[in-house]
Amino acid sequence: MDVGSDFMAGIVVKPRARILHGHDWVFSSEVLKVFGKPADGDVISLKDGRDRLIGSAIYNSKSQIIARRFSRQRQDLDLDFFKRRIAQAAEYRSRRHVDPKLCRVVWSESDGLPGVIIDRYGDHFVLQTLTLAMDLRKDLIANAIVDLFCGASASLAKGEVEAGGAPALQSIVERNDAPIRRAEGLELKSGILRGDASVETEFQIAGVRFAIDLLHGQKTGFYLDQKTNYQIVAEHAAGRRVLDCFADEGAFALTCARAGAADVAAVEENSENIAAGKHNAERNGLKVRWIEQDVFAFLRAAEKAEAQYDLIILDPPSFTKTKSGLRDALRGYRELHLRAFKLLSKDGLLATFSCSHHVSEAAFAQTIADALVDARRSARKLRRFEQALDHPVLPTIPETEYFKGILLEMMPGR
């Protein structure tokens, strides 16, 4: 595989290919012809039907997305390029006042690095390479991270080198165990790419100290796309009976308990997640009732028991990864919200979220409205939730906007 492509190989796209309308992907069905015999993982040229260059892309014939553009110019994937793109991503987050030591530093196409995810937790970095071309170059990417955040060029972001000259990087953890890698023909694996093998780290959100295992914990360590929402929801928790559904490791439950909730119950069916949540509850001196059970089963049982809550949080995993599963996903959301509405007190609050890209914000809102009708309840919409600013949305790539959420207040006497 020619990592240093001479750009002789490439693809000519069909006239109506989405890449001609601002997207950065080329699907196999959008290819007019392939020229120059590119190898999987190569950098290739993209051209339109008039032989005009429309950019440089990474190539994988085994993927449904056969090419992913990373530049509109002729550009190879070398160390200088990775350093430049990562620096640009870090500078964007700095302008948006994102905490530089607790953020997603790079988010794939949103930062011009298709398939690359870099998260930062203090002095530890977590790297995912979800496309073949980027996986072949993960050592280059790791070197770029070291150069930017630990080497002579660490002045890129002010304060990255600690007092006394200590480096601002202890480890780079590889978390390439995401199933989506299989779509690129890649194996699943995780390990240490650079630095200290001790990768438990600690950080604070909404007054709660979280300790996470970057090598063995969920995904890349934490749900950073919800980082600001934990604080927002917790601001409504004081004095309320809180139910956190699909609690995972209990970030909502713990921040609500820290904010003064009268009672907090966290429902999660994964015992390892509950163990991690209990560990963080104990180290913060917080009281949470952990319930290891399927959420739908719990909600049905709670309704029979005539339980009531003043704040319910619904933060389920994606209900569908494909467009074909949309109908079933909407049915699931409708039932989930119906069950929740039946448990809310007369002026209770519901914070509900969806991370399913194929479920549009309009469709999500409609399922909530339908569930309100079914439950014979009325509610006011207090606010929308969005993915955090370190997960940028590109209007020309709809797939970058996957997250939506709503905060509702029930209306008494209706």
Feature-to-residue mapping (PLM):
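Conserved SAM-binding motif I beta-strand of class I
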Residues: 263-268
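Mobile active-site "lid"/loop adjacent to the S-adenosyl-L-methionine
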Residues: 273, 309-339
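Non-catalytic substrate-recognition/targeting regions of SAM-dependent transferases
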Residues: 106-119, 135-150, 165-222
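Conserved class I S-adenosyl-L-methionine
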Residues: 239-246
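Non-catalytic accessory regions of SAM-dependent methyltransferases
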Residues: 1-122, 150-151
